């Protein structure tokens, strides 16, 4: 897992962890679109410049507030396309070759067939002019089952469009077991978000603090996921979870600085 593990900048201890371990970084500074311009952008750029000293590589998390790829309003769809294109440009400037995007599915707003059809169209259009090395990973958030995302991927032809399974979101949003999510989405995964919770709330707890058997989950990912599938630790703290990963052998001694 060493070269595939990233630490999210939402983790309060991400700076300390980068000093102690050889990890990649998932940049969350631009989850808020306002940070892509003005003083927000300047502050984010300063922080990213500092992180480059220790980070092994970068993944960028795209903005997601009020951005819906399957939007019914054409102007809303255009806004999503513009913001994601701006985020992709920032990712490339930062040296990130992978960007995480939210699926944008909202229950009771979009019929699933509509969301499915429009999502295929949107993501194919979005990726049409991107560099060959650039990949997106579409993350489940309010998605209540994995089958729609798998069906979407079966229709998508661009190999640089993959899925991001957020285990914590699947645990607290869906009645489908997380391990079933993994089995269904594994052929299409390019990335994973790992954190735990009580099965009801998106709390981003430490890996062992919640309803998901994280050891069983990680062991199964190693068995069925592609070897280039990256993983981001997305807990609020971070330190305790990385120490657990090291103690369990998911991180080798070579990953310690």
Task: Indicate residue ranges for each PLM-predicted region.
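N-terminal pre-domain/capping segments
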Residues: 1-86, 255-257
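Charged helix-capping and loop-helix junction motifs
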Residues: 40-45, 76-85, 113-123, 175-184, ...
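Hydrophobic faces of well-ordered beta-strands that scaffold small-molecule active sites
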Residues: 3-9, 23-27, 58-62, 99-101, ...
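Active-site beta-loop-alpha junctions enriched in small/polar residues
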Residues: 8-12, 28-32, 63-65, 104-106, ...
